[in-house]
């Protein structure tokens, strides 16, 4: 089952900007997105080797299938999630 991991920080302006696009697109393609706050889930950032926010990781089961980092827009999110 595909799922998304959204690595973000509450102070990150690009993270805030993509949230509505990410959630709407994910819902439309049937992908559940788990939001992971750098300030609360540091161990998850280390586990997945995330060094910048925002970072989106697409998972199929326990395997990473794709990663997108840095500034994003609606089109890049749709392309990434297959929407």
Residue ranges of model-derived segments:
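The canonical Cys-X-X-Cys-His
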Residues: 12-15, 56
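Structural micro-motif
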Residues: 48-57
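Charged, surface-exposed interaction regions in soluble eukaryotic proteins
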Residues: 31-34, 72
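Typically the conserved alpha-helix immediately C-terminal to a functionally engaged Cys/Sec
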Residues: 14-29
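Short active-site neighborhood of thiol/selenol oxidoreductases, capturing the structured segment around
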Residues: 1-10
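Hydrophobic beta-strand anchors of alpha/beta hydrolase catalytic cores
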Residues: 4-5, 33, 56
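Structural microenvironment flanking redox-active thiols in thiol-disulfide oxidoreductases
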Residues: 38-45
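Non-catalytic, surface beta->alpha helical segment in thiol-disulfide oxidoreductase systems
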Residues: 60-83
């Amino acid at each position: 089952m595909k799922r998304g991991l959204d690595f973000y920080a509450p102070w990150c302006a690009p993270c805030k900007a993509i949230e509505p696009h990410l959630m709407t697109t994910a819902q439309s393609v049937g992908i559940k997105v788990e939001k992971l706050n750098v300030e609360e889930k540091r161990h998850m950032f280390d586990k997945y080797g995330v060094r910048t926010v925002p970072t989106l990781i697409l998972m199929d089961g326990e395997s990473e299938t794709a990663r997108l980092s840095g500034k994003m827009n609606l089109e890049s999110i749709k392309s990434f999630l297959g929407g």
